[in-house]
Amino acid sequence: MAVPKKRTSASKTRMRRSHHALAKVNVITDAKTGEYRLSHHVCMTHGTYNGRKVITDNVNTNDNNNNS
């Protein structure tokens, strides 16, 4: 089995773990609704991004329920 020759110091251990930190999420408040959302993402309540409507509401216009 592989066994280290020397003990790893606390400093070396902490330097190795310095990249394990969690990144902070960039959350902003929506200008229209005041809800929190991720920046550079579509507002899911209205389907808007940068003031433009990008997600349309899918309303089923057919009243066929396939009940035969």
UniProtKB/Swiss-Prot annotation:
Statement: the UniProt record of this protein carries the keyword Ribonucleoprotein: yes
- The domain of life for this entry's organism is Bacteria
Q: Does the keyword Ubl conjugation apply?
A: no
Q: What is this protein called?
A: Large ribosomal subunit protein bL32
One function term, GO molecular function aspect? structural constituent of ribosome
InterPro entries (UniProt xref): Ribosomal_bL32, Ribosomal_bL32_bact, Ribosomal_zn-bd
| Keyword terms of this UniProt record | Ribonucleoprotein, Ribosomal protein
A Pfam family this chain is assigned to: Ribosomal_L32p
Assigned GO CC terms? large ribosomal subunit
Q: Which intervals of the chain form a coiled coil?
A: none
GO biological processes: translation
Question: What family name appears in the similarity comment?
Answer: Belongs to the bacterial ribosomal protein bL32 family.
Kindly list the residue ranges recorded as spanning the membrane: none
